Amino acid sequence: MDAVLEPFPADRLFPGSSFLDLGDLNESDFLNNAHFPEHLDHFTENMEDFSNDLFSSFFDDPVLDEKSPLLDMELDSPTPGIQAEHSYSLSGDSAPQSPLVPIKMEDTTQDAEHGAWALGHKLCSIMVKQEQSPELPVDPLAAPSAMAAAAAMATTPLLGLSPLSRLPIPHQAPGEMTQLPVIKAEPLEVNQFLKVTPEDLVQMPPTPPSSHGSDSDGSQSPRSLPPSSPVRPMARSSTAISTSPLLTAPHKLQGTSGPLLLTEEEKRTLIAEGYPIPTKLPLTKAEEKALKRVRRKIKNKISAQESRRKKKEYVECLEKKVETFTSENNELWKKVETLENANRTLLQQLQKLQTLVTNKISRPYKMAATQTGTCLMVAALCFVLVLGSLVPCLPEFSSGSQTVKEDPLAADGVYTASQMPSRSLLFYDDGAGLWEDGRSTLLPMEPPDGWEINPGGPAEQRPRDHLQHDHLDSTHETTKYLSEAWPKDGGNGTSPDFSHSKEWFHDRDLGPNTTIKLS
């Protein structure tokens, strides 16, 4: 990557404006192209000017002031880049997988107020000041002690040390300088912009030797991370890369000389991977490559732990929802059973009420139906009777009724003419044959002279005038009783001269003790 990038020109190290373009910087250009004077005083002044320009460039950058991507992160979420690159998740409360001693939370509360570790996770430059240390004399024998102090830092946590005692003294030759420079951190100027509480500090488990991080997250150099603006208050999650004390600030790796401060997690990971711990600047290619790999693994571990934490929270939320829904379901089942029991009870009561209503209403209804049928039958009978009285009688019946009415009168007229002391019956012999006249057979006529006939004399022995007179009388009686609608010659068309067997009339005296015999 260093071969691809163009060499950084020397005139860009100290630009005329207050804005310093950090996009074109890389580690090799910064370490190789930076030229400093030989004298210490001039070196101190140039370092102060450079640090001031570098420190002010972060505040004068309008892009970072207006919108910083690191300021838009939530408290409980990692950086967007890490969240997008790492989607795997394990258990959020996984214990450290390394047998090394984990970092304790109690060690971080001592220096939290001084903002010592805020320099590493705020990605801002610090002002360095060269001072002469009268307490440390120039001695060639100080080199072994400095190396011993650097080796002790690999196993001793640095969180409990003060900002001045935390920084090792670099080893320099006696001919170069008479007194060793001391880097002094000014926490007062940093704390006015950076305020980190002890709760924001995170304790991460050490990286296991077998862990292999993703190359996608470590493809970028630590210097290429966008710096954050310290003007705005930082209220972000301590698990994010930009706010994590587990990674060294990128600007600390860009120095040309001086001690190299690494975090405890970086040192532990380097030891677990078998890499030597770099203690001073500049870094070699191998050290830079190893440090990049370690930082990439740390970021992957942070992302994985954040994913596991979120997954655990999500699962816990789902479990709570399941419990809530289960309890609600049980309550609803109880309500359903209660409603079903109430429904059965109501159905039984309804059946009983229907039975009672049917028993009470059926009897009067049947009686009313019977009475109605009876009334209808009586009305129909009355109607038939009235209608029958209004129908006119047929002519046959009317003539018959007239005959019935007039027959007694005619009979009275006939019987009044009789002067016989007793009643006599007229009859004819059954074997005598046909009647002489059809009309005469309807009403037998008696001779006007009397009811008595000559005894012992047949009909042919009577005189001829008597027969004619009888025929006229019968015709007169027939026309008197019959209607004019009948033809005069008779409906049967029988002639009055029709001959028939002779009839025998018997005239007998009817006494009180006599009986009538028919022959």
Curated annotation (Swiss-Prot):
Protein name as catalogued: Cyclic AMP-responsive element-binding protein 3-like protein 1
Required for transcriptional activation: annotated span: 1-60
Site (Cleavage) residue list: L426, F427
Presence of keyword Endoplasmic reticulum: yes
Effect of P392L: Abolishes proteolytic cleavage by MBTPS2
Domain bZIP: residue ranges: 290-353
GO cellular component, one term: cytosol
Biased amino acid composition, Low complexity: 210-223
Lumenal compartment residues: 396-519
Keywords linked to the UniProt accession: Activator, Developmental protein, DNA-binding, Endoplasmic reticulum, Glycoprotein, Host-virus interaction, Isopeptide bond, Membrane, Nucleus, Osteogenesis imperfecta, Signal-anchor, Transcription, Transcription regulation, Transmembrane, Transmembrane helix, Ubl conjugation, Unfolded protein response
Transmembrane parts of this sequence: 375-395
